[in-house]
């Protein structure tokens, strides 16, 4: 901290406050500006592209200063928060007119990336998530809150960093807090993690915050229901919110345990590989999200994060989709929904004290749509719709109140008044009347003064510094009445006041102040009245979100030709004419669909061969995406789908170097493969694309074969694409394995991809033809054809290599007996891929 005593009283005050928030930008209120000083000023100037100036001296150097206008601060703060930084708002709480020295100031709120409610700070379609991780005895206890939802969720405890990473990254949090320094050091989330002081994770403090945040009955129920570690992590969130809000987070209305294990699990790598919910235009989420409200878009994202395996829930969703498709009800529903605003976040802003007058207008216009929506839903007689409709609350008394109280186009804030309608409050109308009638008084007063002085150029005016005045040109100085009191001298004129005008000024200014105070009182009373409907509005918001998602699914089903899937418990996966939605949307010609048939009774492993660009990866991805869509309750892109009991989707598709961790492409591939091998079960869907490409041919082939064998033994539903044709021989060893391939046709030295899956193994890989399509020059292609011909004849070396080559055939090496003996000791039916890799390395060393 700077040496305080060497500074002015104002800077001394600033430094004392700043010392409490060393890692946060401090917005220090000075009149109509928020000012920043020292390093904060330098950082803000760069972040916000504002001017860096100076104020006073510190150790002989100018003190850096930057500032933003108070009325425009929200936009600047939003820029900072969206960069993952936090801001402390320091307001003037004392009265400047009575203060001796600097006016009293204190931090009234801390704005962090996950604790914002204002519209400017938020992505309307995404939840703003704060995650807390409490590490104890190598266990991770997790809780999170979506700030404007008003709920805290507990997640089941995890015991390893892989599961922790998948849980946290699936949530896509804006902010992570923890008691664990090791999580910061490991950096497993690739995003900042904030380590809080120990007291945030004190069980004693946790109980205190729970008791302070909820009524006694609910608080005691929570204290009795959850274990010590769960209460501690709940308390850490409440403590953090209390510190940022500078008040108890009363908007938190519930604590939920997300213990439902009946979900389709997909790790973060598989999510990325399948492009489920990333930000790309071709992501499945982007294709499926045509919701009319931000409420619906956020709920759809929650469905994407936790697809349910509860067939009853899925059946209810399917029934609603079918009902919405009948008579095109979804169109009428979506039309109404398009007029409904984000009432969930608006009511949260009311509870948090950050609501704006225009929010109340938006809330009112949304509530006015509910009678039409409820009436339309009553025509659809399904149990799920009836249940949802019962939780849409038609709050007529509130809409009447808001219609009567708030002007149609209110100002941005209540600060300067003009929000409450004329006729709502008699006292306010009378105070405003004094102000509004001032024009008539001033007009009469000016006319009277002109007559009295005989000066027709006399003017009566007003400014904020000097108040009301009578202005006369200096040439009339000899005609100024004796009762005029000089107030201000200008270059060519003089300004005066009279006792009568001064009395009027006092009356008007007093009326303005009283009117503003009265209006603020009415506004606060109105907000308290709105807050009485908090639970009803939150329930209504949740119900509207469900209706929006299901209407969206109905629209997508018709627009994208999706059909209702079936589910079975027999371990069968039967899909006919499946399509890949993203590719289908981005090609001009018709998409070529494909069938898939796997079953625990027949085949669980497909070895897929065929040329690059032939359709192997698309085929595998479309199967995984189709199953995912089925489990979120959507219809699917296939003419028929009967889906077995699948609890997890694993994918190993593509790879690149992980430079930050010092891992090669091959190491990344093997790490992901090991994770799948160690976790896959009979209820898993496994997608493996080109395993073993990142090492030598023999190593890669050996690993790919070992992995395929392992999946055959596990019995997981596996789609295994490869260019190693040797793997097609596995059908002779494992009866639950079958071959399919993607055809290509040659005509006049050109290749044409059929994109159709056919039974059996491919005969060729067509690599040179694909290289031709890619633009490889003719001389290189001719050389490649020659090399290929030599290799196919069984030659050990290419003609272009003249120098002697080491021959690695086992029967010609001195180590022949040792290698043979070692190979004979290996049980290839029980060895793991990693063990196989180690043995290969061991054998290679003996040949060097």
Swiss-Prot record:
Keywords, comma-separated and alphabetical: ATP-binding, DNA damage, DNA repair, DNA-binding, Nucleotide-binding
GO biological process, one term: mismatch repair
PROSITE patterns for this protein: DNA_MISMATCH_REPAIR_2
Origin: domain of life: Bacteria
Pfam families: MutS_I (PF01624), MutS_II (PF05188), MutS_III (PF05192), MutS_IV (PF05190), MutS_V (PF00488)
GO CC annotation: cytosol
Name of the protein in its database record: DNA mismatch repair protein MutS
Homology family: Belongs to the DNA mismatch repair MutS family.
KW Thylakoid (keyword) present: no
Molecular function via GO: ATP binding; ATP-dependent DNA damage sensor activity; damaged DNA binding; mismatched DNA binding
Function: This protein is involved in the repair of mismatches in DNA. It is possible that it carries out the mismatch recognition step. This protein has a weak ATPase activity.
